[in-house]
From Swiss-Prot:
It comes from the Eukaryota. One of its GO terms (cellular component) is cytoplasm. This is Calcipressin-like protein. The modification Phosphothreonine is found at residue 182. One of its GO terms (biological process) is calcium-mediated signaling. Keywords: Phosphoprotein. InterPro entries: Calcipressin, Rcn1_fungi. The gene is RCN1. The keyword RNA-binding does not apply. Belongs to the RCAN family. The keyword Membrane does not apply. The modification Phosphoserine is found at residues 113, 117. It comes from Saccharomyces cerevisiae (strain ATCC 204508 / S288c) (Baker's yeast). Pfam families: Calcipressin. Present with 521 molecules/cell in log phase SD medium.
Amino acid sequence: MGNIITDTIIITSDKCDIVDNDNVERIQVWLSKNILRKFQINENEPLQLIILKRFKRILLICPSHDISQHVMDASRALEMENFNFSYSLQDGQRNLTKQYLKVPESEKMFLISPPASPPPEFDFSKCEDAPQRHIQSHIQQDQQQRLEASQLLPNNPDKNNNGTFTLLKSKVGAITIDRCPTNDGNGQMQLADHVKTAFPPKSIFDTDDDD
């Protein structure tokens, strides 16, 4: 007659101290590799690892019989040869609230699967939007606004106006633009804007040879 499958597995050992921290950690790593990464175990129904130090044993309460059976199958691996795995006589999950199955003083851990990548609710049918080609950074927008506000060149220059206006002015000097008529080749005179760079202020230390 085969073993009755329950959701609770008892781990013992006659070769080592099963409740030693190193062995507990070794079992945790083994469960993570063989169970938690293969099954989606969430915090609502975690895999419970209960350490009974006084009784020198560990209880594994699985979310389902299917998972407990996979734990038993995986326990036959060579890395678990120092540990003994066996089913409990009754389901621990269903009977934890009953007084006669109350777990004695123990350490309890709740193990869950790592987050899936991508998550289970990810919609693979959605396509990523194309990059926005017309969005400017706030720096570009600020520079554009300053350029428009400065009005370096009039929108509709007066063709009969041969005056001068300032292109750039600072404490050091100024750059001015003079409008002057030019011949367009057909005998018609047109205004053309050109930049006239002013000479820097002359120093008292300059000599005539520097001109």
